[in-house]
Design a protein with these regions (language model features):
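Hydrophobic positions on the long internal alpha-helix
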Residues: 68, 83, 114-118, 151-152
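A glycine-rich helix->loop->beta "capping" turn
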Residues: 49-50, 71-84, 90
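Conserved glycine-rich Rossmann-like NAD(P)H-binding loop of the short-chain dehydrogenase/reductase
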Residues: 26-41
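Rossmann-fold scaffold of SDR-type NAD(P)-dependent oxidoreductases
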Residues: 9, 79-87, 107, 132
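Conserved glycine-rich cofactor-binding loop
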Residues: 12-13
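SDR active-site lid
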Residues: 157-193
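Rossmann-fold cofactor-recognition segment
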Residues: 47-63
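Catalytic Tyr-X3-Lys loop
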Residues: 96-112, 123, 127
Length: 193
């Protein structure tokens, strides 16, 4: 098995922490980024594990994202997988057709920032995988969901020649797959995402 470096945002969430634990259990190195890195350590465990780097990250701040990516590169030498929780969980019934709400703008800006943040390293490596986890359509504002899907599709076409794959995966599917998979099946599930 090749050791990879995973960059996981929203790492203190239930799904984020599970992804971090599974990647570590498979021998990978993980940058676990969240607004509260101490919560990551509480959920994930061993802060002494040299393969785990827990970082504070506001994904909306491009400079913070750049600094987190640089910290990951300095510590591990590359980034092979980005798993980003691109979520705006406001109900569709609360959609306001006026100016975009802050949470919509923040979700889309975070999506752009983390993708742009890791792409240079992945291009230079000639490989990488970017997975944006999105909420189920019924729990997600349509404009945010379609912004994420459209962005992923466009970026996937742009970066395919560099060996970088991009996908959007419903978070509930990722959670169900991780719960149902065991042993080597979990490796497959994580790679399929």
């Amino acid at each position: 098995m090749n050791r990879q470096t995973w960059f996981v945002t929203g790492a203190a969430s239930r799904l984020g922490a599970d992804i971090v634990r599974q990647a570590l259990a498979r021998g990978h190195q993980v940058v676990a980024a969240d607004a509260d890195p101490l919560a990551v350590l509480r959920r994930v465990g061993d802060a002494a594990d040299a393969r785990l780097l827990a970082l504070a990250l506001d994904e909306v701040d491009a400079r913070e994202v750049g600094a987190a990516v640089q910290a990951a590169l300095a510590r591990f030498g590359g980034i092979d997988v980005l798993v980003h929780g691109a979520a705006d969980s406001s109900p569709q019934s609360e959609f306001d057709p006026g100016p975009p709400p802050r949470d919509f703008s923040a979700s889309v800006r975070a999506l752009f920032n983390v993708t742009r943040g890791v792409l240079q390293a992945m291009r230079e490596q000639g490989a990488g995988r970017i997975v944006h986890l999105v909420p189920a359509p019924g729990r997600q504002r349509g404009p945010t969901l379609f912004s994420i899907a459209g962005f992923c599709e466009a970026v996937a076409m742009d970066v395919a020649p560099f060996g970088v794959e991009v996908s959007a995966v419903p978070a509930h599917q990722a959670m169900a797959l991780l719960k149902s998979a065991s042993g080597s099946d979990r490796d497959e599930v994580l790679q399929e995402a």
